[in-house]
Amino acid sequence: MTTTTASATFPLRLVDGRRLERRYRDVLLPGGVLVDNQGQARVLPRYFYEVVSWEQASDTYLAPHFAVSEFIHTDVREAPPLRVFPRYIPCATALLALALEQFREAVGSYVYIGANGGYCSPRHARTGGASPHCWGTAANIYRVGDTYLDSHETIAKYAAIAREVLPTVWTRPLGPESWKTDDHLHMDLGYVVSVPREAPGETYNLKLAGDPL
């Protein structure tokens, strides 16, 4: 497995998902493709941060008020290899944490992410199509401060704040249908893939890659 050394300020190792053991590759599908509900192919993340324990997840912050642990709450619907440590999160989860930090500042209170409301692997039982949760760029927020987001009024209120603070964020429409929401605020950054500078990458070969033009 190819990794880079964790820095003094950020303890999680960067991992090339394509070089992980087969059991992890089969559930993370690094660099693979999922198809969204419009029939568009979306390329999955290739690079991940490795989380070796719950203690490390709780002690490592991606933003001043958001620890890694808040993005990896799962239940038995997650694929078995990702129910135990080590766990892997897409690098773009750090971008989501920064967006949530801005949202938290705007609402002036705590923001709570639900179980299975952060990163979910492509093999999670409830993953349907190309969910941004598989990119680590979506969060399901069930509570802000002392307010539970279990009504159209509260969800709409905080969705409007999210869109005002983060103009490019997407919030799920309200309603009882499966593709809508009525008991939490879903916000996501889309299909963002983050490749840190220290990622090894590959030498580009036009003959092998094909001329895109």
Q: What are these model-derived regions, one by one?
A:
Residues 1-49, 205-213:
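N-terminal secretory targeting signals
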Residues 95-128:
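Extended, low-complexity, intrinsically disordered C-terminal regulatory tails
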Residues 85-88, 110-116, 156-163:
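N-terminal start-of-chain detector that recognizes signal peptides
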